[in-house]
Amino acid sequence: MKENYCLQAALVCLGMLCHSHAFAPERRGHLRPSFHGHHEKGKEGQVLQRSKRGWVWNQFFVIEEYTGPDPVLVGRLHSDIDSGDGNIKYILSGEGAGTIFVIDDKSGNIHATKTLDREERAQYTLMAQAVDRDTNRPLEPPSEFIVKVQDINDNPPEFLHETYHANVPERSNVGTSVIQVTASDADDPTYGNSAKLVYSILEGQPYFSVEAQTGIIRTALPNMDREAKEEYHVVIQAKDMGGHMGGLSGTTKVTITLTDVNDNPPKFPQSVYQMSVSEAAVPGEEVGRVKAKDPDIGENGLVTYNIVDGDGMESFEITTDYETQEGVIKLKKPVDFETKRAYSLKVEAANVHIDPKFISNGPFKDTVTVKISVEDADEPPMFLAPSYIHEVQENAAAGTVVGRVHAKDPDAANSPIRYSIDRHTDLDRFFTINPEDGFIKTTKPLDREETAWLNITVFAAEIHNRHQEAKVPVAIRVLDVNDNAPKFAAPYEGFICESDQTKPLSNQPIVTISADDKDDTANGPRFIFSLPPEIIHNPNFTVRDNRDNTAGVYARRGGFSRQKQDLYLLPIVISDGGIPPMSSTNTLTIKVCGCDVNGALLSCNAEAYILNAGLSTGALIAILACIVILLVIVVLFVTLRRQKKEPLIVFEEEDVRENIITYDDEGGGEEDTEAFDIATLQNPDGINGFIPRKDIKPEYQYMPRPGLRPAPNSVDVDDFINTRIQEADNDPTAPPYDSIQIYGYEGRGSVAGSLSSLESATTDSDLDYDYLQNWGPRFKKLADLYGSKDTFDDDS
């Protein structure tokens, strides 16, 4: 700060000297105004020249940041017409006039009353004018002049950012550009060296350097290793005055991070890994993990693992866990303790991404030996085959041996084995198995035609550890035995035309027949068709075997007549090709029918039966007449019944009700009642229609619902009741249809008591039945009967 004050004082003195020099012409007289005008003659014949009067002044300067006790003298204004008698008044106007700059109106001296800052305002433009003090008449036209604020070095350099962050790859060459920092100085760059900056590094050597003029930071050491040190803190200084003494300075911090390159290979921390796996492990199960360390990061540190050698390459595999960068060794296929107890693997770890610039640092991989021991486990029994197929003939006697399954204990203990059948696969219990030797036998005869294949599951378990068990599928084929005779493939029926000719009308077969056999094809076709031996010479029909498992039935003669015989039953023997063969006799029905001249069937009705019955024409007419008379009687009965105004069954008005119980003798109870009036139930008008209550006046017009089904010819009581119940349940708009039972004696002394829901004794109680009015139309009648009790009492 001392240096700054001394510099300011020197600049002030320099400015004063400049100002004094500026006004020197007035004293010396060579800057006095001269008058330029017309010429006049003096007394002695001299020619006088009139000159224009003007200002005597120059451009003014003022030092910024002046802190003296008195106002700074900026300069002095003077006109050549000023004789010093005080008649001229100087006026100052313009920027800062009267506030920053003041003028002595007599002497013309200008002073700065405030401290000026060039960085806020570099110059001020003012107007000067001389006027007559008494009249304020301008003596000279106004003139403009400038007051410049002269700069001093009062602003230190400032960086654009307080801190910088930069990255540079590790192992970069010397001189690699890292980042450029820039500072600025608010001082005047055109005046002196106040704004001339020079950069230097204060912290960060010897790793980095900075260019003095540009501020570019560069690496200063080769092969900087990120794994040794990743982050550096550098301090950069910017100093004005060209870096000379007395200049002001500013600093900034730069954090430089070394980015990673793949300059390190993966490395296993140990040379041998020991692992173990149980022989009971399943493929895909993890055995263990290995990890090679790579100090690089990101993609440069990615490692992949492979098995490159060893006797366990077929039994084990390795995958890479990219989250943990570990090699996961898994079981590829089952291992057996009794077969091989140890394996050796050579595992390689290699970088995924390799930088060619650092290939000389390689190889970027490492290998390790992994030894895996197999641990013994209590294994379940093993069947000698993955599945079994056995055969047995159908109809074989119970206890017939079907086959055998065999399993053994793979462990060294060789525990005894016990066999059993999964009964979920043999629900009918067709088979049994010897638990000790595994022989499978039948328990009942089998039928191939029902099931040709039977599939069961057999379990084998260790006798000392039932939890150790194995299972195997066993397929049993039921072999066919010729135990089914062939039969007609369809219910065949033949037709033959009646005629007067004695020879057959056609050489075509009456019908072509074929057969089916439930047995296997070996015991089925070829089928042989023939007539039974006893009718081999049938005079009417014959059978010709077509030798293709079909046969044709032919007529041996003509002249068939329906009057003589309209139906023939022809037995046909069918034999199969089994050993021994099976045969059956099937009956073919052949009808004699009427045909046209072309042989087309016209009718095969039952006239022959009527004619052959021996009835005369008169008898037939009598039978038909009786039938007609009976039909006429029935029609008349129905017609008369419909024309009657009243139904056939008449009820008294008070008896027209549904399910009215009538006592033959009073007293007793409901056990003495007749439950139903069968006549009412038999009334056909009440089956599906609506029967109105004659003792109840309907509140609204009721639209009868159609019956659920048409009325039968004869009424069934049970169906009638169920139908009515279903209609009532499904009709929410139906009015209440109460069944009120009236008893002459309520039976207070009866042991059985009353089963009726409406007891007349309750009419004398004090119950309030007005709430029935709110229960809707179904309870309207009850509300009228019980809710108006008081009214009836009053009337009586």
UniProtKB/Swiss-Prot annotation:
The chain crosses the membrane at residues 618-640. Expressed mainly in brain but also found in other tissues. Expressed in neuroblasts. In the embryo from 67 to 72 days of gestation, detected at high levels in facial mesenchyme including the central palatal mesenchyme, dental mesenchyme, the eye and optic muscle, and the tongue (at protein level). Changing residue 140 to K: In TBHS2; results in loss of cell adhesion as shown by a cell-substrate adhesion assay. One of its GO terms (biological process) is cell-substrate adhesion. This is Cadherin-11. It is a single-pass type I membrane protein. It is linked to A chromosomal aberration involving CDH11 is a common genetic feature of aneurysmal bone cyst, a benign osseous neoplasm. Translocation t(16;17)(q22;p13) with USP6. The translocation generates a fusion gene in which the strong CDH11 promoter is fused to the entire USP6 coding sequence, resulting in USP6 transcriptional up-regulation. Elsahy-Waters syndrome: An autosomal recessive syndrome characterized by moderate intellectual disability, hypospadias and characteristic craniofacial morphology, which includes brachycephaly, facial asymmetry, exotropia, hypertelorism, telechantus, broad nose, concave nasal ridge, underdeveloped mid-face, prognathism, and radicular dentin dysplasia. It comes from Homo sapiens. One of its GO terms (molecular function) is cadherin binding. The keyword Transmembrane applies. Glycans are attached at residues 455, 540. Keywords: Calcium, Cell adhesion, Cell membrane, Chromosomal rearrangement, Cleavage on pair of basic residues, Deafness, Disease variant, Glycoprotein, Intellectual disability, Membrane, Metal-binding, Phosphoprotein, Repeat, Signal, Transmembrane, Transmembrane helix.
